[in-house]
């Protein structure tokens, strides 16, 4: 799952969907390090020690709390502290209860997918495309398991910041026919 949040479409979609400001991307929410993704994909049987080496670039059992690795969209530093947690740093602060719930549910889905993943892959994928962003993110959410009526509100909130259509990858395919029908109706009525 970590490889799915590579500097590719999924990471870009997540950052755009949750509304991460460009000013945060420069310091507090840097994109995932390519070398980390490549190292973790090469590691066929990961252990805590090998994951630590993959994350820090070398085995670091005692790290400085505020080191450079901490300021990534995905922060694994707390795994080696007493917390044993993962931190998603791509969210902006909000007090809207529905947005907070949607963001929390999204994090749970990401964590569940990562936990259940049998393997990881760093293969190149289709690049981020503004025209199909909403559609691509909807498909990503459905693959995470966010399908059905109980996730409808979450999908709506997370896709609100993305351009494009959630139903059509390249925009509506029936537009020419709809335009022709509208012109025909206008000619008859006008």
Give names to the regions the model predicted.
Residues 1-190:
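C-terminal accessory/tail domains of diverse enzymes
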């Amino acid at each position: 799952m970590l490889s799915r949040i590579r500097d590719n479409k999924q990471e870009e979609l997540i950052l755009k969907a949750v509304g991460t400001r460009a000013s945060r991307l420069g310091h507090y929410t840097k994109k995932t390090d390519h070398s980390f993704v490549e190292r973790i994909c090469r590691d066929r049987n990961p252990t805590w020690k090998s994951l630590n080496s993959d994350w820090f670039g070398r085995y670091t059992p005692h790290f400085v709390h505020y080191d450079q690795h901490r300021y990534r969209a995905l922060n694994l530093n707390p795994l080696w502290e007493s917390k044993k947690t993962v931190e998603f740093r791509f969210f902006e602060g909000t007090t809207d209860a529905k947005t907070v719930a949607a963001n929390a549910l999204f994090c749970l889905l990401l964590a569940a997918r990562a936990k259940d993943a049998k393997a990881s892959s760093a293969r190149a994928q289709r690049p981020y495309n503004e025209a199909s962003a909403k559609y691509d993110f909807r498909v990503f959410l459905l693959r995470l398991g966010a399908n059905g009526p109980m996730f409808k509100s979450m999908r709506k909130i997370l896709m609100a910041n993305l351009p494009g259509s959630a139903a059509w990858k390249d925009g509506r395919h029936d537009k020419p026919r709809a335009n022709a029908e509208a012109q025909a109706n206008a000619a008859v009525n006008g």
